[in-house]
Amino acid sequence: MMLEVPRYTWRSPSNIKVVAEPGLGPGRWLLPGAHQPSCPPAPHQGPLQKPSQSAPGPTASASAPPRPRRRPPPQRPHRCPDCDKAFSYPSKLATHRLAHGGARPHPCPDCPKAFSYPSKLAAHRLTHSGARPHPCPHCPKAFGHRSKLAAHLWTHAPTRPYPCPDCPKSFCYPSKLAAHRHTHHATDARPYPCPHCPKAFSFPSKLAAHRLCHDPPTAPGSQATARHRCSSCGQAFGQRRLLLLHQRSHHQVEHKGERD
């Protein structure tokens, strides 16, 4: 059984009538009036099969698609003058510099806090709604922030390959072991002294939180950022214990009438 291949006729750019005949092979054409070589038809056995791709010949390698080029690293020509970060667009740099300038143009409608970025405000508002969209895959607990979930997942770690040489505790990461030894076992565990009192602290964040005790409380209506505000007079404090001391010492007479 022979396959019938249709005959195609078209005109070339030089206005010559070209006829494609079957059996001439690729790249060979028959002009009208030319003699067509005769060859016996090959017997067809079984269905047509595609050539094997396991061992491609020179023609197959030539027709293979080129490999995709590796994408070059993104260009970040806009560098922050206050830190080492760089950005691709000026708008990204302008948004980043809000963190250095202390500007917080995104206030929370439910509390006096304000934030530099809309994403920080959106994450903060989850604390007011009570939503916990980040569940733990190992226990029923859920968290409002991914960072809280990441900190909680350490409790489910199967191994703790970094033991403390001074106590039976062990840790999942070397950074946690270093922080533990710095806090509990170092002789100079408090290298950050307070400039206003004899106290000293292990970490700069602890010192910064303590220095709020020496700063005067913000007046009512002030734009200064404070975490704990008195509901009676409007004064704000950096720590909750200072707010409780203020309420016991200033508003106990008014509410209970124990003093003149």
Curated annotation (Swiss-Prot):
Residues 67-78 have a biased composition (Basic residues). One of its GO terms (cellular component) is nucleus. One of its GO terms (molecular function) is zinc ion binding. Gene3D superfamilies: Classic Zinc Finger (3.30.160.60). May be involved in transcriptional regulation. Coiled coil: none annotated. A zinc finger (C2H2-type) spans 78-100, 106-128, 134-156, 162-184, 192-214, 228-255. This is Zinc finger protein 575. Residues 22-81 are annotated as: Disordered. Keywords: DNA-binding, Metal-binding, Nucleus, Repeat, Transcription, Transcription regulation, Zinc, Zinc-finger. Residues 51-64 have a biased composition (Low complexity). It is found in: Nucleus. The keyword Transport does not apply. The keyword Nucleus applies. Belongs to the krueppel C2H2-type zinc-finger protein family. It holds the Pfam family zf-C2H2. The gene is ZNF575. It comes from Macaca fascicularis (Crab-eating macaque).
